[in-house]
Amino acid sequence: DRWNKKLLLKKKLLKVIENNFIKYGFDPLETPSFEIAENIGSFLAEDESNPMSDVFSFKDGTKDITLRYDLSSPLARFVAQNNQDLPPIFKRYAIQNVFRNEKAGNARYREFTQADCDIVGNVNPAQANAELCNLIASTLLECSLKTDQFIINVSNRKIIQGLIKDLKIPDSKQTKVMRAIDKLDKPGFGLRGVEDLL
């Protein structure tokens, strides 16, 4: 639960974030809390035999329904369904709660608010990354952080996939390795936790 000063601070920070999204030309998108499981693909689940284990899901008649795990999967579904109506470069932001079916712990929540923005379409990746870095930096500065109080990391999944391929990791283990790498900087994991996953 959040109330009083903590909730007011959260609302104030989210307003700063949203104002910066708008200032940088991003349009708002709101998606349902529930998605049809087959529309959102698989997640980075610990249990490879049950790739949807990290999401809250249930059956609605004959369909598997899940609570929104992140904001990227609903964006992918939205773009696929509305591609004909979208501009060549689609800049969208979303600020909504997401849900994780995992053990709650220090800095790990089953429900939390995610603020997300993406640039989709015919765009130069370097330009898009530069714009997003500028947006992040200006937002953090407006939230009263100083430049020596934050670091912006840019990662590219294709680079990691290329390294995995160069290391000749078998196809059957590549997904597990990607999942482990994804956990590297998460609280409570670190190098030892990643080694245990592998």
Residue ranges and their predicted role:
Residues D1-L198:
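Extended, charged alpha-beta segments that form solvent-exposed binding/catalytic grooves
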